[in-house]
């Protein structure tokens, strides 16, 4: 299991430090990482606080250097075949297609045609429904990431953790089913 903490808002790094401590005790098998990282100093800070992986909305070679030095996987956001290629050249195994809802499944399919070795995660506009998830997996995405559509504010505010768990479980089932029919 992996969980990406979004680096957004004042004192986000302090909240992350507490979440890492909680996860180490309550979910020791879960990899805690950080997302929305755009520069090397931010990557360094979160790595020092315990991030097991770093995700960004864009590709920054300086973030790749920091992560490579500490053997921390870096998944940069890429919006073109060129960006994916450049990210792979500096050691990024998994590249994030972002924003997915703008680029679409055909972008992933087109990318994988000349670069079938590419490992692709799609975020931004992925929704926890069977058709949406299947469209990405069938296009060649290796995995998808979801945020507010998987964790709606109203559900979180109500403390309805069963609904969150159910939606996560359903989404994983949709991924498995899409992979089987691929």
Per-region residue spans from a language model:
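Glycine/small-residue-rich phosphate/adenosyl-binding loop
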Residues: 51
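C-terminal alpha-helix
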Residues: 170-178
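Eukaryotic N-terminal low-complexity, Ser/Thr- and Lys/Arg-rich leader segments
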Residues: 180-182
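Active-site-adjacent beta->alpha loops and helix N-cap segments on the catalytic face
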Residues: 5-24, 39-44, 54-88, 97-116, ...
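Glycine-rich beta-alpha junction loops
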Residues: 124-130, 149-150
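Short glycine/proline-rich, acidic loop/turn segments that cap or connect secondary-structure elements
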Residues: 134-148
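Hydrophobic faces of well-ordered beta-strands that scaffold small-molecule active sites
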Residues: 1-5, 30-36, 54-55, 74-77, ...
């Amino acid at each position: 299991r992996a969980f990406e903490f979004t680096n957004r808002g004042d004192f986000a790094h302090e909240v992350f430090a507490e979440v890492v401590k909680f996860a180490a005790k309550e979910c020791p098998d879960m990899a805690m990482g950080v997302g929305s990282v755009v520069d090397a100093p931010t990557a360094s800070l979160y790595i020092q606080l315990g991030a097991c992986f770093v995700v960004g909305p864009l590709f920054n070679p300086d973030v790749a250097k920091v992560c490579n030095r500490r053997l921390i996987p870096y998944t940069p956001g890429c919006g073109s075949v060129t960006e994916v290629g450049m990210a792979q050249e500096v050691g990024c195994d998994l590249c994030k297609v972002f924003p997915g809802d703008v680029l679409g499944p055909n972008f992933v399919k087109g990318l994988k045609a000349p670069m079938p070795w590419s490992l692709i995660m799609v975020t931004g506009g992925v929704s926890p429904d069977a058709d949406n998830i299947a469209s990405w997996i069938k296009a060649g995405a290796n995995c998808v990431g979801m945020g507010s559509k998987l964790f709606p504010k109203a559900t979180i505010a109500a403390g309805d953790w069963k609904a969150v768990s159910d939606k996560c479980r359903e989404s994983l089932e949709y991924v498995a089913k899409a992979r089987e029919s691929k």
